[in-house]
Amino acid sequence: MARVKGSVATRKRRKRILKLAKGYYGAKHRLFKTAKEQVMNSYYYAFRDRRQKKRDFRKLWIARINAAARMNGLSYSKLMHGLKLADIEVNRKMLADIAIADAAAFTALAEEAKKALAK
């Protein structure tokens, strides 16, 4: 039986990695070994940052809500507690959008929170 050197499989594997590394800077898209390392790192970054993105957006929403709440004389935590007491179930994403797009509606929500806190 003839010896098989596996050049087809090797070329296919290398081609796949170099295709994934397309657009990387310098040797990271030219050389197989460095490209492979960078692709592995890219998978790690993608996995990590899909989770990080959720935390980052929540932080952004809280910062926006806090800024709008302070314009209405409340801190973020007092506003959230007041909304909970008033049985107003609006999530942070929607609250942040309301704070930016419709200041009057946010002010009305802040007033409701103040009333609930006063009781």
Curated annotation (Swiss-Prot):
InterPro entries: Ribosomal_bL20, RIBOSOMAL_L20_CS, Ribosomal_protein_bL20_C. Pfam families: Ribosomal_L20. The keyword RNA-binding applies. One of its GO terms (biological process) is ribosomal large subunit assembly. GO terms for molecular function: rRNA binding; structural constituent of ribosome. Keywords: Ribonucleoprotein, Ribosomal protein, RNA-binding, rRNA-binding. It comes from the Bacteria. Transmembrane segments: none annotated. SUPFAM superfamilies: Ribosomal protein L20 (SSF74731). GO terms for cellular component: ribonucleoprotein complex; ribosome. Binds directly to 23S ribosomal RNA and is necessary for the in vitro assembly process of the 50S ribosomal subunit. It is not involved in the protein synthesizing functions of that subunit. Belongs to the bacterial ribosomal protein bL20 family. HAMAP family: Ribosomal_bL20. This is Large ribosomal subunit protein bL20. The lineage of its organism: Bacteria, Bacillati, Bacillota, Bacilli, Lactobacillales.
